[in-house]
């Protein structure tokens, strides 16, 4: 009987054990992204100097151990970001675009530029992102990259998976925004 109770308690606690917590932010083990089901691949914290900037979780259709697997995974995806300090939309998007440029050559950036401009303009509609703001960058295979801020969609979806892969390279590229964060998003802990 005690063994049965222990097994039941373990089974009930498994979803809680599967969720990840970073800097007080809980990332659920699963997320519905459009019509697709995703699982948390990894989560970590972006830091600049001594400042905690945001907690981030990467959701994929299935777990990926390498950047290549994550970048090439088929189906819905989500980058979930929770700000850990007050940011302006301009600070936030300019830092993302700088990291985007670090992971793409001039020719690739020229091709992506109209989508980068659309993304920047959409991000700027946020205005300020107070601490604990939630930003989702979703890949919806049927429509494109969708930006939501605190649960509300911002702007039109950005067509083309090339742009979403470019966004992923900010954190998973050859020159990631932060090396240890790349490892954490790939499910490695250190």
Placement of each model-derived feature along the sequence:
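N-terminal secretory signal peptides
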Residues: 19-73
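Mid-length scaffold segments of soluble, non-membrane domains
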Residues: 64-142
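Hydrophobic helical h-region of N-terminal Sec-dependent signal peptides
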Residues: 6-10
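Positively charged n-region of N-terminal signal peptides that target proteins for export
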Residues: 1-4
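Cysteine/selenocysteine-centered motifs that mediate thiol-based redox chemistry or coordinate metal-sulfur cofactors
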Residues: 179-190
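N-terminal signal peptide c-region/cleavage motif recognized by signal peptidases
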Residues: 13-15
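Flexible glycine-rich active-site/ligand-binding loops centered on an Asp-His dyad
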Residues: 154-181
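Short strand-turn-strand beta-turns centered on an Asx-Gly dipeptide
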Residues: 149-152
């Amino acid at each position: 009987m005690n063994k049965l109770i222990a097994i039941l308690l373990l089974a009930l606690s498994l979803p809680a054990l599967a969720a990840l917590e970073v800097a007080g932010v809980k990332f659920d083990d699963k997320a519905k992204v459009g019509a697709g089901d995703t699982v948390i691949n990894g989560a970590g914290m972006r830091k600049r100097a001594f400042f905690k900037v945001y907690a981030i979780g990467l959701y994929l259709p299935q777990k990926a151990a390498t950047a290549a697997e994550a970048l090439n995974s088929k189906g819905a995806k989500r980058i979930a970001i929770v700000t850990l300090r007050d940011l302006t939309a301009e600070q936030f998007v300019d830092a993302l675009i700088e990291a985007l440029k670090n992971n793409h050559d001039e020719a690739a950036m020229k091709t992506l530029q109209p989508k980068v401009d659309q993304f920047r303009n959409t991000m700027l509609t946020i205005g300020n992102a107070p601490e604990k703001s939630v930003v989702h960058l979703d890949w919806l295979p049927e429509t494109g990259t969708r930006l939501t801020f605190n649960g509300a969609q911002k702007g039109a979806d950005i067509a083309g998976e090339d742009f979403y892969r470019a966004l992923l390279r900010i954190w998973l590229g050859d020159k990631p925004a932060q090396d240890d964060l790349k490892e954490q998003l790939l499910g490695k802990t250190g």
